[in-house]
A protein has these predicted regions:
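Non-catalytic, usually N-terminal nucleic-acid engagement modules in DNA/RNA processing proteins
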Residues: 102
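Alpha-helix N-cap/helix-start capping motif
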Residues: 82, 106-107
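Domain-level signal for Mg2+-assisted phosphodiester chemistry and nucleotide/NA-binding surfaces
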Residues: 1-93, 98, 114-118, 122
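Acidic, divalent-metal-coordinating active-site segment for phosphoryl/phosphodiester hydrolysis
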Residues: 107-113
Length: 123
């Protein structure tokens, strides 16, 4: 999130790139976002049939995170980033979100964060 303050009753969407984010950092992300508002939308994106996402398994249930299945369409290519970006834009233009949290170690989401900020919302 930016250093820009939002209301305590703000609606926040947390979008997790489970393919490229460590579940070890989830608690700290939830803590920071929880101080900024209410995390009403919690989604984790990935190909849940992969063993590499096993660490996310119990956390999704414990923290009411909706696992969003995205199969790999082509070998060696992940469609997860595209799915997450489309969902973020849908949420942005619906107008019911006051801020976003994007959890990923993938710099591919930088243009998405910039675009959301252009619309006046913190990321």
């Amino acid at each position: 999130m930016t250093d820009r303050r939002i209301d305590a009753d703000a609606n926040i969407a947390l979008l997790i790139d489970a393919d490229n984010a460590s579940p070890d950092h989830l608690d700290s992300v939830l803590l920071v976002l929880g101080e900024l508002g209410t995390i009403n939308i919690r989604r984790a994106y990935g190909n849940w049939s992969k063993t590499s996402l096993k660490g996310w398994g119990t956390l999704t249930g414990e923290h009411s995170i909706l696992p969003m299945q995205q199969f790999d369409v082509t070998k060696g290519k992940s469609a997860t980033d595209m799915r997450m970006t489309i969902d973020a834009m849908d949420l942005l233009y619906r107008g019911n979100v006051d801020g976003f949290g994007i959890m990923s170690s993938d710099s591919d989401f930088l243009p998405l964060a910039q675009r959301i900020r252009e619309e006046g919302l913190p990321v």
